[in-house]
Amino acid sequence: MSRRRAHDTEDESYDHRRNKRRRVSENQEIEDRLESLILRVGERSTSSVESNLEGLVSVLEADLGTFRLKILRILSDCAVRMPEKCTVYTTLVGLLNAKNYKFGGEFVDHMVKTFKESLKLCRWDAARYSLRFLADLVNCHVISATSLLQLLDTMIDVSNEDTVPQVRRDWFVFAVLSTLPWVGRDLYEKKESSLESLLLRIEVYLNKRSKKHHNALRVWTSDAPHPQEEYLDCLWAQIRKLRQDNWAEKHIPRPYLVFDSILCEALQHNLPQITPPPHHDNFEYPMPWVVYRMFDYTDCPDGPNLPGAHSIERFLIEEHLHHIIETHHRERKDCAAQLLNFPFKHKIPLEYCIVEVIFAELFHMPTPRYLDICYGSILIELCKLQPGTLPQVLAQATEILFMRIDSMNTSCFDRFVNWFSYHLSNFKFTWSWDEWDSCLLLDAEHPRPKFIQEVLLKCLRLSYHQRITEMMPTTYAKLIPVTPVPNYKYTSEEAANLPGTTVALQLVGAIRQKCTPEEVVNILKEIPSSGYSGEEMSDGSFNALKIDVFVQTLLNLGSKSFSHSFAAISKFHVVFRALAETEEAQICILHNIFELWSSHQQMMVVLIDKLLKLQIVDCSAVATWIFSKEMTGEFTKMYLWEILHLTIKKMNKHVIKLNVELSDAKEKLSKADSSSSDTDEDTPHKRKKPITHADKPSEEVVERMEEKLEAANVNQKRLFLIVFQRFIMILSEHLLRSDTDGRDPDTDWYRWTIGRLQQVFLMHHEQVQKYSSTLETLLFTSDLDTHILEVFQQFVALRA
């Protein structure tokens, strides 16, 4: 009997475990089904949004007892991750609150917690979407208007904080302003005086805030035909216009209006007192921006009108399109399809809105959110999906950009060149060049001919020289790039008179015979130390002729392709390192690369990048070479600044990498110490796996890492000091010479150069910011010319 009972017990235990697994599996299936239903509510289907909501409320109400926490989590996630469906989800919550007041209160608490956590973790978009959701719950009779106004007032209190960055105060004001389109009408009807008081406080703040940063962020220096408005000023103008219209807007779908008779019977909840977390030095706030405008209603003659620049609909449409790009930017085809499936496409000139928003992203200052090619590839997909209209709108936009290029920001000029050349390469390089031939009468440094020349140089990278020559009208001959071939002087007509010719020819033979680096060194020993007596670059600390012969000969032999050049550099890396012991020697190497490859800009860019990666030349040497007298004729060409920026980025990445490694090492060391002490105290069954001795870095290793980081920071600071000092020198010299000669200093050269200075500040703002006090003390002092000093002050104001 005992055996039988034991057997029965085992069967019962097995059945219990099987039933438990089945229940877990069934619960998981129900949870997945609920999540799918919630995520898809309001999307296009055969039934209306309202009937979808009614059906979903019935399903959720039945499952609240079992899956309450899961439903709370999904709904709060949707509020943050799907802001375009905000009113659909607030209506859903409102209907659930009308049926189950307790659940409504729990959801409000959950949403408040999400909002507070987002603020604490500096998730600014998530915080703004959470605030918007809470505000829209007022429309659904879930939250009282009084408690929402208290929250908005508390947020505006931040604008009165002292000793905090303006960008913090700006964000809280922006968050409140951007919420008002959803709830303004309800507040106006129920609490008009409180709403007016809130708006007055916002106006007082906006009138006194500094806008020193504004000019640094403009796409164009001119306000004709469209003003370049600072984002808070623009949104404030849109809110004022909305107030004039009695808070009636035409864009936001409001499904809760259909259920008003149900919702108005529900009891409301009061928001708790919410205090924004205080400022900490490690908090990073969104930087200000300028609202980009390319079109107005006169540019889109057919179909629906484009909303005015100060209509709230323009803000709502643009924000929605920006969010679509943010959500789908990794998949260009999906992104293009989603943009063209914009919910209100029949009410607006959609193609114009999309093109304007994409260029707003591309030209966003200080840097775009994503790579330039991301926007280019999305535009190509849009042209494929909408071939009847979008290419024409894009051509119209390109024409507008070209006509306004005279006053375009230098960074945006570069992005325009990169986008247009990439776009042409995907459409057989077809363009109506004859319409732009008036630019051929302008000075070569003028932005219009300069743009075409730079576009052709970029097209050359994406094609070949003969193709570029064939695609251009003969009138553009002077702007067509020269054939990119090496200029190897040791086989030229004057080679017999050059001091290194004999050794160069000997070196050619040896390298072709696959000689070793040691054999190359021995051949170079035949060049006497004083062999370059007539060369001003040689100061006695290195042999310039050895560098000349070796670099030009080796790279000429590897000139067939990038791969051949890289292989040559890698094979004779030791020789390069031996010759490049000093910064002067490294500059001499760069001089010889330029002398050999002056007609092939891309080759120079990739070779210098390779030399930096292999640590043959230092970043400071590249910066010094760029500002040398030899490069004066190249100073306004894009490739030179491409080299400077890749050099600075290389240094920045190195510093960031060392920072991360040091932080990880310190964290491991700290965890190892705490783990060893915890292990002694824990009981055996609770003991965690301690960090092993192999994982734990020693104190000496951490100290060495700190020393490496300190040295890297010193080199980074030195690099920025070299760059900014050289800028100041050449700009000051130009301004002084113009003043002495009685000439207008505002030349094309000056605008390019001051634009490049601004570009360095903005493109590398995160790293430069660390040294702003040093730069202010050593370089950007009060006695500096105001034109140069303003660029620095505008940069500092970005995070002030």
From Swiss-Prot:
A cellular-component GO term for this protein: nucleus
Gene Ontology molecular function terms on file: mRNA binding; RNA cap binding
Region spans: Disordered: 1-26, 669-698
Family of this protein: Belongs to the NCBP1 family.
Function: Component of the cap-binding complex (CBC), which binds cotranscriptionally to the 5'-cap of pre-mRNAs and is involved in various processes such as pre-mRNA splicing and RNA-mediated gene silencing (RNAi). The CBC complex is involved in miRNA-mediated RNA interference via its interaction with Ars2 and is required for primary microRNAs (miRNAs) processing. Also involved in innate immunity via the short interfering RNAs (siRNAs) processing machinery by restricting the viral RNA production.
Organism of this sequence: Drosophila grimshawi
Residues carrying Phosphothreonine: 9
Name of protein: Nuclear cap-binding protein subunit 1
Keywords (A to Z) from UniProt: mRNA capping, mRNA processing, mRNA splicing, Nucleus, Phosphoprotein, RNA-mediated gene silencing
